[in-house]
Curated annotation (Swiss-Prot):
Reactions listed under catalytic activity: L-histidinol phosphate + 2-oxoglutarate = 3-(imidazol-4-yl)-2-oxopropyl phosphate + L-glutamate
Phylogenetic lineage: Bacteria, Pseudomonadati, Pseudomonadota, Gammaproteobacteria, Enterobacterales
Protein name from the UniProt record: Histidinol-phosphate aminotransferase
Record flagged with keyword Hydrolase: no
Biochemical pathway: Amino-acid biosynthesis; L-histidine biosynthesis; L-histidine from 5-phospho-alpha-D-ribose 1-diphosphate: step 7/9
Entry's family note: Belongs to the class-II pyridoxal-phosphate-dependent aminotransferase family. Histidinol-phosphate aminotransferase subfamily.
Presence of keyword Chloroplast: no
EC number of this enzyme: 2.6.1.9
Cofactor(s) needed by this chain: pyridoxal 5'-phosphate
HAMAP family named in the record: HisC_aminotrans_2
Amino acid sequence: MSTVTITDLARENVRNLTPYQSARRLGGNGDVWLNANEYPTAVEFQLTQQTLNRYPECQPKAVIENYAQYAGVKPEQVLVSRGADEGIELLIRAFCEPGKDAILYYPPTYGMYSVSAETIGVECRTVPTLDNWQLDLQGISDKLDGVKVVYVCSPNNPTGQLINPQDFRILLELTRGKAIVVADEAYIEFCPQASLAGWLTEYPHLAILRTLSKAFALAGLRCGFTLANEEVINLLMKVIAPYPLSTPVADIAAQALSPQGIVAMRERVAQIIAEREYLIAALKEISCVEQVFDSETNYILARFKASSAVFKSLWDQGIILRDQNKQPSLSGCLRITVGTREESQRVIDALRAEQV
């Protein structure tokens, strides 16, 4: 008699799933953490809501209204969730039939699009980007049949560049009446002029993902947003959990999105951009660095000689970067989060000492 294990009882696609390797899952014992695109120092908040005996609102009014005002959209066009990652999954759950529909994305890019789809049992299709990391529109057109959700990260993680807005428009026309196009704007605060939020009235099938994890310095809060037309938001409300945000999270998010909170965020962005340019200039002068790519974000992608050895050497010194070698077209590349000046100097000094 054969013995059935607990794993045997699991869904086949879950048994075969490779989970997303987050920075925290990968571990490390560093004191310079530059692998998760977090803000380098903590921002202090005081809790003002003391009603922890009551369930929170599903969509806290103050958070929704503050974010709508900040993003320049109507409150009815905003959904708040447990990070933008939940927004990624909600869109698949609302629009894709497992075993029938597909999502489409463009590697090298963020890994959670595929993980979310595979968890639900939805097919993943990819069209690798062109050599300049822009969209291959012909390749996309050839693969759209049966696709319900298209993910485009702009600025793209991990490459750091914006997607050409004209290409976005062509994509939105190709998919009109066929699929939802999701612009992942997790890093848009570092290049706000490039946001597509103003396009929502023109394209009813456009959705935009946002987060408080990066420029707002609240990665530990797990608070993200989906901006879309009311019809899309109403569908997402059918599949979201009844209480996605805890009371403390909603409390802090509302404070972060107050007028003074927005001013503080923009000051942080200016500081990170200045530090980014300092680090880029220094990296370009280091012998083990082959190429430094332009960035519109709070991280830098660079190609190294003997990148695996460099990565391990810095790891052993307590400087934790993100290895991108396994991503398509990113052989030899490491991603470096922009931290404090002290952290930048640690990276620069360690790289200058590398003998490769």
